[in-house]
Curated annotation (Swiss-Prot):
This is Guanine nucleotide-binding protein subunit alpha-15. Guanine nucleotide-binding proteins (G proteins) are involved as modulators or transducers in various transmembrane signaling systems. GO terms for cellular component: heterotrimeric G-protein complex; plasma membrane; synapse. GO terms for biological process: calcium-mediated signaling; phospholipase C-activating G protein-coupled acetylcholine receptor signaling pathway. The gene is GNA15. One of its GO terms (molecular function) is GTP binding. It comes from Homo sapiens. CDD domains: G-alpha (cd00066).
Length: 374
């Protein structure tokens, strides 16, 4: 204590070593103060959800809306992935046709199917004309179209119909992927990916983690200092099974994961932003795939996308309420967090722009106000 007082009151009494130590101490304090300001100025959002719920697409949208987007050279870099997605999709349908015993409508289609199956989809970097012709022929085959209509019975990329409908453009020489092509490209997220951007002079860091079960053990160290949790769930997966486990309903798995995350101690007072994604795909499939077949408690009208959306939102809301309240309404603990829900289409830039503005104006503004950053 005496030496500390001497440092403040009698700096001329210090030895050279003590003066050097004092300078180091001051520098450390300056760095710590700067770090504290920086920590307050960068807000961390954790992006969670099951595989193929649209997390990576959401990150791409943040780059387009709040960042520099994708330059022509960067979009060119997605070309092999777009090609691979097309080969993976067509291969999945050809294999499913055999399992589902769906015949080709034209005898020539067998030759084109054999050609496509001879190519390893993950080694594709160019799109040769013979493969382009084979793909275009097959996509016009009534058997392939019938197989596509039964896509809930096998795993097929959501982007399949989009890419196959644009084959002529995509297989042209000198093809450069559009922003929409990039948004719809699919590569499973492994490990942890982060994207930083600024909104109204506030730095945001969105942390995206792998959605497959095998990746979830890597989440643990992302939970600290998160101001909000964004949970993406697919509205269209009510009639599908997990890619990792063909016996488990994907929506039930997503609901269970949502409940598990809500129970984690790190999130006791963290606001939860629920994005019920893929409204477009739900609207496409609901006329022929009835929600009540997979969720018998649904009493709403058939072929009604709005009724289906409300029912699915209610399931997630009840899961949230159940994690806040114990049996018969008894409180499990003091929870100051709130649930904010939005219907989204992650491939629709205008939709995501509006939804994220709503998030910014509610959750982020509330948090910034609390720490006096507004």
């Amino acid at each position: 204590m005496a030496r500390s007082l001497t440092w403040r009151c009698c700096p001329w009494c210090l030895t050279e070593d003590e003066k050097a130590a004092a300078r180091v101490d001051q520098e450390i304090n300056r760095i710590l103060l700067e770090q504290k300001k920086q920590d307050r100025g960068e807000l961390k959002l954790l992006l969670l959800g099951p595989g193929e719920s649209g997390k990576s697409t959401f990150i791409k949208q943040m780059r387009i809306i709040h960042g520099a987007g994708y330059s022509e050279e960067e979009r060119k870099g997605f070309r092999p992935l777009v090609y691979q997605n097309i080969f993976v999709s067509m291969r999945a349908m050809i294999e499913a046709m055999e399992r589902l015993q769906i015949p080709f409508s034209r005898p020539e289609s067998k030759h084109h199917a054999s050609l496509v199956m001879s190519q390893d989809p993950y080694k594709v970097t160019t799109f040769e004309k013979r493969y382009a012709a084979a793909m275009q022929w097959l996509w016009r085959d009534a058997g392939i179209r019938a197989c596509y209509e039964r896509r809930r019975e096998f795993h097929l990329l959501d982007s399949a119909v989009y890419y196959l409908s644009h084959l002529e453009r995509i297989t042209e020489e000198g093809y450069v992927p559009t922003a929409q092509d990039v948004l719809r490209s699919r590569m499973p997220t492994t490990g942890i990916n982060e994207y930083c951007f600024s909104v109204q002079k506030t730095n945001l860091r969105i942390v995206d983690v792998g959605g497959q079960k095998s990746e979830r053990k890597k989440w643990i160290h992302c939970f600290e200092n998160v101001i909000a949790l964004i949970y993406l769930a697919s509205l269209s997966e009510y009639d599908q099974c997990l890619e990792e486990n063909n016996q488990e309903n994907r929506m039930k798995e997503s609901l269970a994961l949502f409940g598990t995350i809500l129970e984690l101690p790190w999130f006791k007072s963290t606001s939860v932003i629920l994005f019920l994604n893929k409204t477009d795909i739900l609207e496409e499939k609901i006329p022929t795939s009835h929600l009540a077949t997979y969720f018998p408690s649904f009493q709403g009208p058939k072929q009604d996308a709005e009724a289906a959306k409300r029912f699915i939102l209610d399931m997630y809301t009840r899961m949230y309420t159940g994690c806040v309240d114990g049996p018969e309404g008894s409180k499990k603990g003091a929870r100051s967090r709130r649930l904010f829900s939005h219907y989204t289409c992650a491939t629709d830039t205008q939709n995501i722009r509006k939804v994220f503005k709503d998030v910014r104006d509610s959750v982020l503004a509330r948090y910034l106000d609390e720490i006096n950053l507004l």
